[in-house]
């Protein structure tokens, strides 16, 4: 906001912005318009950001997701491609790949999850910072894919709380970016602090219901699937 000063009829220094700051004119009338137009309230709205603390925290979290540099098989190639200049994942604030799970809050399960690898993934997930999120990328991570055998876990959600599923074999980098945007929307709409409660074991987070479970009956009742061109 700009402040200007001038001299009155008696030679006294007067501020031409003071009536605007007080919100009243010299004769009790509404303040004169500011240089940008509008009243004092309008000037405050243009120059001061107002909001709730939980909204500011949600805004900061959704645009500063730190993914863990972790991959399993071919889907990791598409994940790595999303970090190149062509797709530019930095637009969404998630370009900071962390080399240790202790500095990350997002893990992307990109590839086939073998039974021997599941305990390792769970161990890495337990070391991540709270709050933490999981993206299941590709058909193998979502449901085992084409490997319906004893050595492959049939879905990463059998041992991890998956937040977003990205379909495809393998999914394009664009699909991963769309999944990241869905995760950001979920993070931004999360209630705070009502989503955390103090229980017998300390602060506990109320788990959101899984859309996979909520839409299970709807998917089972589907008689026909749309063609890939119509999706």
From Swiss-Prot:
Reaction(s) this enzyme catalyzes, per UniProt: a quinone + NADH + 5 H(+)(in) = a quinol + NAD(+) + 4 H(+)(out)
Cofactor(s), by name: [4Fe-4S] cluster
Record-level GO BP terms: aerobic respiration; electron transport coupled proton transport
Region spans: Disordered: 207-231
One Gene Ontology CC term in the entry: respiratory chain complex I
EC code(s) of this entry: 7.1.1.-
Bias kind Basic and acidic residues: ranges: 207-219
Keywords of this entry: 4Fe-4S, Cell inner membrane, Cell membrane, Iron, Iron-sulfur, Membrane, Metal-binding, NAD, Quinone, Translocase, Transport, Ubiquinone
Disulfide links within the chain: none
GO MF annotation, one: iron ion binding
Membrane-topology descriptor: Peripheral membrane protein
Cofactor binding comment, as recorded: Binds 1 [4Fe-4S] cluster.
Annotated binding of [4Fe-4S] cluster, by residue: 74-75, 140, 169
Pfam families for the chain: Oxidored_q6 (PF01058)
Compartmental location: Cell inner membrane
NCBIfam families: nuoB_fam (TIGR01957), PRK06411.1 (NF005012)
Function text: NDH-1 shuttles electrons from NADH, via FMN and iron-sulfur (Fe-S) centers, to quinones in the respiratory chain. The immediate electron acceptor for the enzyme in this species is believed to be ubiquinone. Couples the redox reaction to proton translocation (for every two electrons transferred, four hydrogen ions are translocated across the cytoplasmic membrane), and thus conserves the redox energy in a proton gradient.
Similarity annotation: Belongs to the complex I 20 kDa subunit family.
Subunit structure: NDH-1 is composed of 14 different subunits. Subunits NuoB, C, D, E, F, and G constitute the peripheral sector of the complex.
Protein's name in the database: NADH-quinone oxidoreductase subunit B 2
Top-level taxonomy: Bacteria, Pseudomonadati, Pseudomonadota, Alphaproteobacteria, Acetobacterales
Gene: nuoB2
